[in-house]
């Protein structure tokens, strides 16, 4: 049985109950980093930002956030000056090509909740197996747009600002850690730890490391965002108040 499991979302109630039924105690969820879901286009694309409503109209079949009309073509997203100066103007109706994660992914579920108001994805969203594959595909598709973990960013793409409540919010460390950026989420380690036993030495050492300043530096190097020092200490206190 594994002692640690990485997760990009909280446990579902059914998953939590299954864990309790099997082991007889609650799972321990440790927040170790913050991830942002970026909405990516080619770097040369003139589009700079999208609203949450526009994301719903792009990616959702049900459009519960807006009940607006679907967006199918790039001229529906760009103003006249942007469109006329772009490569899209060479084609009368240049379609938006949509890319996202598959249904087994926590990113798929998170974007569905936050950007689609729990609605259904359009069947035109091509599902790919990883954030890296989405970003590589978008980098090579002039009309491509996709959502993916910011940690997978490569040259040749850019993450759009997201307008939330009328205010455009860039994705950066400040907006993600402050909660201003609307598509940010915590990343967890699920710890299988009986409350009446101490953590195994290797598990304890790893958790102390990932929650240290050095461990959080590695988090940053991997393209994610560190949690605050107060959060680090709170997690350590919770883990080691009864464990050695």
What are these model-predicted stretches?
Residues 1-244:
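Flexible loop/hinge segments at secondary-structure junctions
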């Amino acid at each position: 049985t594994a002692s640690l499991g990485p997760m990009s979302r909280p446990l579902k109630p059914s998953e939590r109950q299954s864990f309790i039924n099997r082991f007889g105690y609650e799972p321990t969820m440790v927040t170790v980093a913050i991830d942002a879901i970026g909405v990516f286009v080619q770097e040369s694309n003139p589009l700079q930002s999208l609203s949450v409503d526009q994301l719903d109209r792009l990616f959702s079949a049900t459009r519960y956030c807006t009940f607006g009309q679907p967006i199918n073509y790039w001229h529906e997203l760009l103003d006249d000056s942007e469109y006329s100066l772009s490569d899209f103007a060479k084609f009368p109706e240049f379609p938006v090509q949509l890319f996202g994660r598959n249904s087994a992914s926590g990113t798929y579920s998170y974007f569905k909740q936050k950007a689609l108001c729990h609605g259904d994805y359009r069947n035109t969203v091509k599902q790919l197996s990883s954030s890296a594959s989405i970003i590589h595909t978008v980098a090579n598709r002039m009309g491509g747009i996709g959502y993916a973990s910011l940690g997978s960013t490569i040259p040749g793409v850019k993450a759009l600002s997201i307008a939330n409540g009328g205010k455009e919010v860039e994705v950066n460390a400040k907006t993600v850690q402050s909660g201003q950026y609307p598509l940010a989420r915590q990343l967890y380690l699920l710890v299988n730890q009986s409350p009446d036993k101490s953590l195994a030495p290797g598990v304890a050492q790893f958790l102390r490391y990932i929650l240290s300043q050095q461990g959080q530096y590695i988090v940053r190097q991997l393209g994610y965002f560190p949690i605050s020092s107060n959060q680090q200490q709170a997690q350590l206190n919770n883990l080691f108040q009864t464990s050695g």
